[in-house]
């Protein structure tokens, strides 16, 4: 429908005034010739990249990873750092829990010599460091481990047993308002790792909730619920964890998908095992009995041997990874390897108390 000529002139004058006052690009039509595609960074897991729909975690946004203890939260975050560093990006790790193991990080592929690390004394200090790094425009990925460890200054200076109702929630709410715009302008990915608590007196529904108030839930573009669902064994020895990640919230693609992969102790996400599973599912790898073949050549008997073959031949693994991403991410018609969750699947941390 055509706009009245007088209105058109008034709108043009208003837009001109806004751009003059706030800068070019401060307001524009949504359909203008400007790429709306979101730049992403791989999570280190092919199946999780596919479940996210865009091929990874979005730059310029806030992401929350939460789950029970020893479920793989920090491992997943470190894998994101390793993937970002391989692309030449600068990363920072805000270690509020004072528990980062540099030896383990190095095993996961993190370049610890070029990783910025801070162990702040208070929650306010941690969030101010995040804001300063973001405003510099020079840092691409920031990890905060964890929200539960971001202790307000008043609580640290007070006595144990003192009541500090809602302090952490207010601190996080203020930080989200301040950080969201700066992250977008700097195109910086900020990942918050969070812990789970139990709500008291919940008779029906999920009693689980996350710490730090409700603000993080609203500002996060992606929320990932990570759980350990089993053990990976080599004979009788446990060598890793079977892990499931649910995409609880997703603003860049369809939510409620999930991915399953293995986290091997001392190695991280078993990407080669994922390549074998997805390759078989999408008929890029042939499976006859226990034997696996790629392009007519046998690559191993059993999944473990096939995975080892890909590990020893990174060029073939990269070729297979590229084919799967083209098939499943770039508008391909391949069947999605990750099924949408059922209608009963609910956000595992739907309502958050303000103080824990």
From Swiss-Prot:
ATP binds at residues 67-74. It is found in: Cytoplasm. The keyword Lipid biosynthesis does not apply. InterPro entries: AAA+_ATPase (IPR003593), DNA_recomb/repair_RecA (IPR013765), DNA_recomb/repair_RecA_CS (IPR020584), P-loop_NTPase (IPR027417), RecA-like_C (IPR049261), RecA-like_N (IPR049428), RecA_ATP-bd (IPR020588), RecA_C_sf (IPR023400). Its main location: cytoplasm. One of its GO terms (molecular function) is single-stranded DNA binding. Keywords: ATP-binding, Cytoplasm, DNA damage, DNA recombination, DNA repair, DNA-binding, Nucleotide-binding, SOS response. CDD domains: RecA. SMART domains: AAA. GO terms for biological process: DNA recombination; DNA repair; SOS response. One of its GO terms (cellular component) is cytosol. The keyword Cytoplasm applies. Belongs to the RecA family. Can catalyze the hydrolysis of ATP in the presence of single-stranded DNA, the ATP-dependent uptake of single-stranded DNA by duplex DNA, and the ATP-dependent hybridization of homologous single-stranded DNAs. It interacts with LexA causing its activation and leading to its autocatalytic cleavage. This is Protein RecA. It comes from Yersinia pestis (strain Pestoides F). The gene is recA.
